[in-house]
């Protein structure tokens, strides 16, 4: 895992997948590399990107730039877990994300673990169902993260106060 500093922002980068791809041309085969990278600030922002080039380092650089462009903010509960359970789908891949008590840790498979580590989540239980393709699982995980909402945002949508939408929400300190 490497750190990238840009605009006073430290981002962690995780290389999730590297493939050698082949293009058959008139004169034979042309080889290139494909890379998939997850980038995050460990404080609630994460992004994923894909890049292709003739060299691995170039593909990784392109993937990193694509990931930075696609970064998104995710509301976290106490800066350690998600606010509520959520399901995400992408093609044949399906992921279930469940919030967890403090001290549980990150219980998730490979590519999902990279996302949660870059996001800054410390306690979560994640289960993948169906396809285990890296691209599909990351896409499904981002679909689930897009569906997350903090109690504050739900209250604003309903034109209510935070303590009116849930019995337990009066105890929640909103960190957005």
Swiss-Prot record:
Keyword Kinase: no
Source species, domain of life: Bacteria
GO MF annotation terms: rRNA binding; structural constituent of ribosome
This protein's UniProt keywords: Ribonucleoprotein, Ribosomal protein, RNA-binding, rRNA-binding
SUPFAM superfamilies, sorted: dsRNA-binding domain-like (SSF54768), Ribosomal protein S5 domain 2-like (SSF54211)
Function recorded in the entry: With S4 and S12 plays an important role in translational accuracy. Located at the back of the 30S subunit body where it stabilizes the conformation of the head with respect to the body.
Sequence similarity: Belongs to the universal ribosomal protein uS5 family.
HAMAP family: Ribosomal_uS5_B
UniProt name for this protein: Small ribosomal subunit protein uS5
Organism: Rickettsia peacockii (strain Rustic)
């Amino acid at each position: 895992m490497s750190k990238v500093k840009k605009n006073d922002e430290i981002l962690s980068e995780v290389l999730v997948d590297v493939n050698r791809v082949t293009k058959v041309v008139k004169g034979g085969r042309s080889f290139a590399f494909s890379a998939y990278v997850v980038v995050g600030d460990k404080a609630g922002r994460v992004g994923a990107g894909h890049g292709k080039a003739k060299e691995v380092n170039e593909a990784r650089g392109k993937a990193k730039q694509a990931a930075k462009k696609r970064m998104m903010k995710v509301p976290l509960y106490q800066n350690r877990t998600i606010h509520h359970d959520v399901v995400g789908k992408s093609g044949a891949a399906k992921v279930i994300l469940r919030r967890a008590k403090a001290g549980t840790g990150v219980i998730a498979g490979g590519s999902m673990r990279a996302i949660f580590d870059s996001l800054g989540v410390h306690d979560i239980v994640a289960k993948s169902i169906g396809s285990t393709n890296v691209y599909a699982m990351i896409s499904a995980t981002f679909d689930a993260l897009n569906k997350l909402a903090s109690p504050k945002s739900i209250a604003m949508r309903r034109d209510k106060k935070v303590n009116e939408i849930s019995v337990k929400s009066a105890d929640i300190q909103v960190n957005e």
